[in-house]
Amino acid sequence: MASQGTKRSYEQMETGGERQNANEIRASVGRMVGGIGRFYIQMCTELKLSDNEGRLIQNSITIERMVLSAFDERRNKYLEEHPSTGRDPKKTGGPIYRRRDGKWVRELVLYDKEELRRIWRQANNGEDATAGLTHLMIWHSNLNDATYQRTRALVRTGMDPRMCSLMQGSTLPRRSGAAGAAVKGVGTMVMELIRMIKRGVNDRNFWRGENGRRTRIAYERMCNILKGKFQTAAQRAMMDQVRESRNPGNAEIEDLIFLARSALILRGAVAHKSCLPACVYGLAVASGYDFEREGYSLVGIDPFRLLQNSQVFSLIRPNENPAHKSQLVWMACHSAAFEDLRVSSFIRGTRVLPRGQLSTRGVQIASNENMETMNSSTLELRSKYWAIRTRSGGNTNQQRASAGQVSVQPSFSVQRNLPFERATIMAAFTGNPEGRTSDMRTEIIRMMENSRPEDVSFQGRGVFELSDEKATNPIVPSFDMSNEGSYFFGDNAEEYDN
């Protein structure tokens, strides 16, 4: 990984800040989540939500989506230029759930976008507070990552469903900025680039003219973002070739798919942040907590602390298991959809199950679902230990690319060895080794063949007691390494549909 000298920390990206010292970063991240909390409290007042209704995660998501929609300038412009009947482009809305006579009822609210922008700015000292909006987008993205599998999207772009662990952030909107780019997985970036190249192949004018020049700049920027995620020289050199191609086409798509496969062992560096639902920040602000004064970090103990004493509810469908629903949201809160289940289980203190064994569907409730049979239950979001979130793919300190598992992108920087079936992965490389990038391909394959599953990732990094906020006494967990620890492995989760 490049030294911190050349990279802003992702806390800085998150807050759009220039270089700051640790205290300034903690303060500006605190200001950001405090603003989200103040906004949420104000919205609960506007919508006349009771305490319990304000703690309902479905209401939180609706309120978050409304403010994101209010600030989506490109879409708002599009809606005003292409008016559709029965839809007011100046309004946005969604389902709000209220408790009436011992039942949950759904009420569709409509809100003026201008009014939402006003309330948001007012909660954020009059600023647009784009960082807070991005934070909400990342929370929604992490929730999608934990809930849905992207097999169909992978197959559509010619990638392999086994690469699902590379798909972090695949539902993030384009406008999510540097903080969004930091949390996107290698597979997500590859998929965006392939879609772009395919458009260029099918549409002669895609790269031409004034628009084409802008497209080209976007293409090269995306290539550089992806290059920055790779940790070996050969992978980066291959990205340079993809970026410099005069007329990107099938050869580039081949190279990108090859690189995505290589990332199953030579892991990319992908950031992880604990982004919590707005209602959690709202509860803390309402109880008098001053985030900006106390400081806050998305990658340390703070989110764990916040979840230890927040009570959040969720609607539960008749045949869903509340414990499973809790696990889903816990994973989303800690951006742990692609983490090794054994690591997650150890930190959480209860067994974390693979997606296919969970009796729960997504958190959001469709408008045609019957509310009569809906119950609600408290989400169990507490943990036994905390661990520092990582932005590395889990490499050994010898800076040799270490083994990664077909199905894991570490979220927590906790020592473990990553078992993987080399045969499974290498089988994906029976392909053409010729072409412009043959020497790089050969080198990448050689590195993959030499990587040893028993190499330890994050040497010496452990988990910490919740009382150990300065991370002074690491506890290095020992894992049963005999079984695959992947969440989506051999799975039947629903697909994500926009």
UniProtKB/Swiss-Prot annotation:
Localization annotation: Virion; Host nucleus
Main location: virion
A Gene Ontology molecular function term of the record: RNA binding
InterPro entries hit by this protein: Flu_NP (IPR002141)
UniProt keyword RNA-binding present: yes
GO biological process: symbiont entry into host cell; viral penetration into host nucleus
Post-translational modification, as annotated: Late in virus-infected cells, may be cleaved from a 56-kDa protein to a 53-kDa protein by a cellular caspase. This cleavage might be a marker for the onset of apoptosis in infected cells or have a specific function in virus host interaction.
Segments for region (Disordered): 1-22
Keyword annotations: Capsid protein, Helical capsid protein, Host nucleus, Host-virus interaction, Ribonucleoprotein, RNA-binding, Viral nucleoprotein, Viral penetration into host nucleus, Virion, Virus entry into host cell
Motif Unconventional nuclear localization signal: chain residues: 1-18
GO cellular component: helical viral capsid; host cell; host cell nucleus; ribonucleoprotein complex; viral nucleocapsid
Function, as annotated: Encapsidates the negative strand viral RNA, protecting it from nucleases. The encapsidated genomic RNA is termed the ribonucleoprotein (RNP) and serves as template for transcription and replication. The RNP needs to be localized in the host nucleus to start an infectious cycle, but is too large to diffuse through the nuclear pore complex. NP comprises at least 2 nuclear localization signals that are responsible for the active RNP import into the nucleus through cellular importin alpha/beta pathway.
Record-stated family: Belongs to the influenza viruses nucleoprotein family.
Record's subunit section: Homomultimerizes to form the nucleocapsid. May bind host exportin-1/XPO1. Binds to viral genomic RNA. Protein-RNA contacts are mediated by a combination of electrostatic interactions between positively charged residues and the phosphate backbone and planar interactions between aromatic side chains and bases.
Name of the featured protein: Nucleoprotein
Provenance organism: Influenza A virus (strain A/Gull/Maryland/1815/1979 H13N6)
Gene it is expressed from: NP
